[in-house]
């Protein structure tokens, strides 16, 4: 975690941060084009829809993207890989966190078609003061892989509209002591407070970044991977 806001997380490979690590979703790079960072709050629903995750550590002749120093993380969402079925779940956590998820997978039909759909909504107050947030996730995928064929087609569309308040300042122990109601308060946040009886933050993150991908996989023979 960094900052304490929802989704303000990070991943390090071999000691290198995300600016030196390529993150791919169905082969599409999603690192920021200007600074190389990745904002996980934009891809919150990936944990619910991923059918596979591939990690290559360090420099190498990767076939997925330009090699990076830290490595490459490839996240796959294939409809034909999911078994038939559906589910509805409700999750409740500390600090007012709740998440509702509904999903359905058609499974692979005799003709080779498969469909997956997922919708979810979350909200929470955040562990740090004045870091509440709310968001919704959407995902749909259509796959086609007939029996005996060396070709597999997959179309995916996903996104995670969200907003959340952040804490992006370095807080000293003295600040924790001075502003805590009962001694040291690790939840104290100088970026926010109350305005007209409602939570207010000078650091409000809001985004919706839909991603559509189309993949055509051709397996020439069993010796090639």
Residue ranges, per PLM feature:
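Extracytoplasmic beta-strand/coil segments of soluble accessory domains associated
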Residues: 1-29, 45, 51
